[in-house]
Amino acid sequence: MRERASAEEVKTRCEENGLEVPRDLLDADGGTMCASTLDLYIKYSKYSVLAFLMNTFPAVRDRMLADPRFAFKLMVETGADVVMNTATEIKQRGDVFWDEFEFFACDQIAAFAVNTAILTICSPAIVLGNTTRSMRKLGELSKNANGAAKVWYVARKYVGKLPANVFMLDPKLGMMAKLARGGATVIARGGQIFFVSTLCGTVGQATANSLMMLRRAAGRDKYSKGYAESIDVSVDPPVLDTGLLWGRFMMFSANIRQQLVVGGERAVEQFTAGMPSASGRRLANGATVALRVFNNLKGGSDFNDFVIGQAIAEASRRDGGHA
């Protein structure tokens, strides 16, 4: 089998399978694709859920094509989080669970989006073509820019060349170069995770508050009697502060934990590479389940501790201000 499929072959095979050639592939120089990647793209497109993910989220698609197990990892990561969060919320909220259901539902949706984004950010991706239009444009802008704009474009270009996680650093690099690029990778991924987590947390809390106000406007009979009597209409959960709380926690804790999980999976995959395919796949999948379930348990526990710590610190600041 040839290493790369020509642009004409890519177009023909996609049309034969009732698919459109990805827009960014058409924008790439030459429009060629690795033959194995093309086979995987066509295979995934036959499954409606995977086809939806690939067509809707190009970043997820590029990870799925780079790693045949990415979809499984995503399912375990998000599925385990949903199950454990639901169990925890039911236990903690108890009798008021249905009275606060809008907050639970919005938290779940926001958490799903954040978990998907974090795994995507820290996972390797394929580049469908050679040089995409956006990369060419970035190169042109960096050449013509001056001052702060020049620094910004150069920084963007540098970050774009960093690996998805520290375990993908070039082994040929010296120790100091590895430390520098490894540190830059952690910081860059942390910045991306902070932005996404803050956005999801803010939107999720704003949506929950809006649903809460609509529910209250419909009448207190929409709540249990005891809960209705305890409602303070003058107080709403903070929106931006909640988003920033998510962002601060995720950029450090979730960033490091996700990179460690990806590194663990990478080590297991390398270990199973020489094993029979069925046995190796079962071992790799088992390791993914164990690592990602533990990651969710650890993350949930750490987040609760973080929230409590932030609440105590805020109370101390208020007490100090009144002193």
Each predicted region: which residue ranges?
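Glycine-rich, hydrophobic membrane-spanning regions of integral membrane proteins that mediate transport
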Residues: 1-323
